Amino acid sequence: MRALTPLELAVAVSLGGTVAATMVPTFLRNVHASRLSEPVDGLKRIAARATLRASGLPTESAYPESVAFTPAVTPRAELVLDPPGTWDAPTWRALDFSFDAPHAYAFAFESSNSEGHSTFTARARGDLDGDGVTSSFAISGSIERGAEPKLQPMEIYREVE
């Protein structure tokens, strides 16, 4: 096997650098996007179940009771595996929402029910880089007596914190 000439070596290094320069940002973007799918998909699941529940119940009991962020402490720069019972609150059971695998976000559900009008807001927050600044996601819905439930667009604050 012969040694590479300086020109061949320069071409190989240049080609390797070009491949790395295009592949690394794409890889990092895909990893980051996969982390963003957790709060978006989680809130979509919560909203879908809350809306389905509201369409079949009287307005004054359309949405389950509010529940604080679960887990109580927002994960910081790590995935957490919740101990048994973390997602056993009646609201999470009514919405059939929990995590069996490690996750990076905490979720909350806020509701207000009355005879003529009921609302909910589901929230997710996470601190992917552990700097104490959280990304926040929220989706809201409502139902008026005699009408179909409505969902608002998802709100995202500090998507990349």
Outline where the language-model segments fall.
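Repeat-solenoid scaffold signature
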Residues: 21, 29-32, 36-48
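Short, glycine/small-hydrophobic-rich surface segments
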Residues: 40-45, 50-97
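Low-complexity, S/T/G/P-rich flexible repeat/linker segments used as non-globular hinges
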Residues: 134-161
